[in-house]
């Protein structure tokens, strides 16, 4: 589990319908719950459910950030917002929290609050595009599950999100954009890690748009080399190619 996540969980009890954990932390919590290994991760990726968000959550979150003493407070610009908080005063708090909101005004800031501009890297740009897509946002809202009292995106929904991120970053790199190849590989490998949780009875309803993205992913991934042994993934990971 991510360092400091226990305190985060305790602080936001009662707000479980207002946010969902995605990304590596969601994968880590799910895999740990199934007693399966996952890669190390130090950041917590949070998406706010704008239809449910309350001013009280925003106040509580800002109080939590101040309590943690995060050294770096960053905010992106634009209609949708990314906030990044890094380097807390102790390991009782996650090293990094990244929070995404389709509504830029969810946090109630104090007058003396200083948030520096957040550089838009490939990961932020890609995730923003995915979450602003209505089909993926609807999947996020309907595809949650609770793991030890924490709302996370379920494995069958994390896989399409990871697949879409892989397709998006791969295309951006082919088009000449500056994209870290490690991020592309990370999403691909995570799909195979999560595929261990897929059974013959697993079902997930997808919109036509997301279904087409998954078909494209499965077609393109067939040409990729994946070292399942190094990922500590058993051969059941191969089933993703046969979905």
Give a label for each model feature.
Residues 1-243:
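Compositionally biased terminal segments of proteins
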């Amino acid at each position: 589990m991510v360092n400091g996540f226990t305190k985060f969980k305790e602080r936001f009890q009662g707000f479980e319908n207002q946010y969902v954990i995605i990304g590596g932390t969601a994968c880590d919590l799910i895999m740990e719950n199934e007693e399966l290994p996952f890669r190390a991760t130090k950041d917590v990726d949070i998406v706010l459910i704008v239809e449910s968000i309350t001013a009280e959550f925003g106040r509580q979150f800002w109080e939590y950030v101040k309590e943690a003493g995060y050294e770096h407070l960053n905010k992106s610009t634009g209609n949708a917002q990314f906030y990044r908080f890094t380097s807390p005063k102790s390991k009782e708090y996650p090293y990094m929290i990244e929070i995404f909101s389709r509504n830029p005004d969810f946090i109630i800031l104090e007058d003396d609050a200083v948030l520096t501009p957040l550089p838009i890297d490939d990961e932020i740009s890609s995730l923003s595009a995915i979450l602003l897509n209505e089909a993926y946002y609807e999947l996020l809202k309907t595809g949650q599950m609770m793991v030890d009292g924490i709302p996370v995106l379920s494995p069958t929904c994390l896989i399409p999100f990871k697949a879409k991120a892989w397709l998006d970053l791969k295309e951006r790199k082919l088009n000449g954009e500056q994209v870290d190849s490690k991020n592309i590989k990370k999403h691909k490998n995570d799909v195979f890690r999560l595929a261990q949780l897929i059974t013959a009875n697993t079902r997930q309803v997808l919109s036509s748009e997301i279904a087409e993205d998954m078909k494209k992913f499965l077609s393109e991934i067939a040409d990729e080399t994946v070292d399942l042994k190094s990922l500590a993934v058993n051969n059941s990971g191969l089933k993703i190619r046969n979905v």
